[in-house]
Amino acid sequence: MRNEHYRCVKKKLKNIIITEIEECTSVEAMIKNGKRIGSGGYGAIYQLANGWLVKKSLKPSSLDAEEDKKNCLEGLGCKNDLLLEGLVMSVLSELNSEHFVKFEKIYKCGPNYYIMMENLGADCIPFTDFIETKQLSHKERLSILFQLTYALQLAHMKFSFVHGDLIGKNIMIKKVPREYKEYGMYGELDNQGIRVIIIDFGFSRLKYKGIPLYQTHRHPEWFRNDAERFDGTADICKIYNNPNFVKDLNISSNINKCKNRGLTHVAVPPFPINLTAEDILKSNLFDEITIET
C-alpha cells in the first residue's frame, strides 16, 4: 500500500512541469508592470494587469536534486519552495473548490523561478485592499468568514491541510453575481456577491495518500510532532485573531479564545479549540440573509 501511495505522489510530482525560458526580459517586464500583493523572505506574489497571479521565488537550492525529490515523496520533507507549492496546489485541485487558487506551471528564467497561478481577473483583489474600498456589512463579513472556514475545514478533513499564513493579503476577494451557493450539508447560503480565494502556499503542509508533504527548512522547531504540524486550528485562529475579519461580529465564544492566545506571525499550533463552519451557522446571522430583488 505504501508503494501505491508513493506512486500516486510521484505522479503528482511529474505533473509539476518546469518550463525554461531563455529570454527573461518579457517575464520581468510583466512583473514590473504588475502589482506586488504580497512578499516575504522566500519570494513575492504579483498580480499582473490582465489578472494572472505570479509568484517569483528565490532560487531553490536543490530544485533538480533527485535526493531532495525522493525525500519529499517519502514524506521526509521538501527543501525547495516551488516543488512543494506546486504539489500543494495540485493536490487541492482535487477538491474542485472555487476557494483555492489553481496551479498552472513553473517557469525557470535564468536563476529565477516563477509559479504561474490561474487568472482570477483584474477585479479580484486582496482582502486588505477590498476593505479599503468599502465598509463591509455584517452579512458580507459573515459570508467571507464562512467561505474561509468551510474551505479550510473541507481541505483539512480530506488532506490534513494547513495553510500556515492566512493573512489578509493571502486571501483574495472577487465580486461575483449574488446567488445562493451549495455548501454540502449546510445547504444553500447567500454568497453576498463575494467569492473568497486562498493563495500563497509557502508555509502550507498536507498529507496526500498518507504521505506528509511539508518543507524542512521552515523553522522545524515550531512543531514537536505531526499532530502539531497538521493541526488545522492554527488557520482558524489566525483568521479569528484578525479584527478585520471579526469586527462587530459575535459568532462564537471560541473566537475570544483565539483572540486571547497572543498568536505568533504564523499561528503555531496547537490550540485548544476547534471552530467549524457549523459554529458560524449557529450564530443565526444566516437566518437573516435574503437576496433583495
Regions found by a protein language model. Name each.
Residues I18-G51:
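ATP-binding glycine-rich phosphate-binding loop
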Residues H156-K174, E179-E188:
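Catalytic-loop of the protein kinase fold
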Residues G187-D279:
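C-lobe/activation-segment region of protein kinase-like
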Residues M1-I18:
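Intrinsically disordered, low-complexity regulatory segments that flank or precede the catalytic domain
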Residues C78, H99-K139:
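Conserved structural core of kinase catalytic domains
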Residues K59-P60, A122, K174, R178, ...:
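Activation segment
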